[in-house]
A protein has these predicted regions:
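Non-transmembrane, aqueous-exposed alpha-helical and coiled segments at domain scale
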Residues: 1-170
Length: 170
């Protein structure tokens, strides 16, 4: 909802289509879209942890490379290992794994659709789909993002929480 509001404000339009490959040409004229054929991309990276940081950095850098006609064999397959990642996968699947980067500056906003992700491995209890993706010969690297939320810090003591169920399980 926030993105729609930002785009309406910037583009002065009231009808923003849902993001997908088929609606790229229908986006407001000020929105930057991929200039490359996404169907020609092949995976080179599996990335675990598709948070905002990843989408605004690694994914965007690869997108910019692809915009220059390079790196089309370095597309991203997203992955997650937590139950909440299932909802994110479904949201991204519904928009053909496209994401939107809104860059704010003192002089305004730039809105760009990022197309470097081409798939998101299904989340399974045994991580079988993730392991299968990582084992593919075309995958050159596996990357991951770890944020402060991944460190299991006790909010009271500000110390590592070794009693957290996830840590005990590991």
């Amino acid at each position: 909802r926030e993105l729609d509001d930002l785009m309406r404000e910037k583009m002065q339009t009231s009808a923003i289509p849902k993001l997908s490959n088929s609606t790229l040409s229908k986006l407001p004229s000020g929105v930057k879209i991929p200039n490359y054929n996404r169907s020609n991309l092949t995976a080179g990276i599996v990335h675990i942890g598709l948070g905002n940081f990843h989408r605004a950095h690694q994914s965007w850098y690869l997108h910019r490379l692809m915009q220059q006609g390079k790196g089309h064999d370095w597309a991203i397959i997203g992955a997650g290992v937590k139950e909440f990642d299932k909802a994110q996968r479904l949201k991204l699947l519904a928009q053909d794994f496209l994401t939107t980067l809104v860059e704010l500056s003192p002089v305004g906003r730039e809105v760009e659709v990022v197309g470097s992700m081409i798939d998101y491995a299904p989340i399974e209890a045994n991580n079988g789909a993730l392991i299968a993706q990582m084992a593919k010969p075309e995958i050159k690297i596996v990357t991951l993002t770890v944020t402060e939320g991944g460190y299991y810090v006790d909010p009271v003591s500000k110390s590592f929480d070794s009693s957290h169920p996830d840590i005990v399980y590991d």
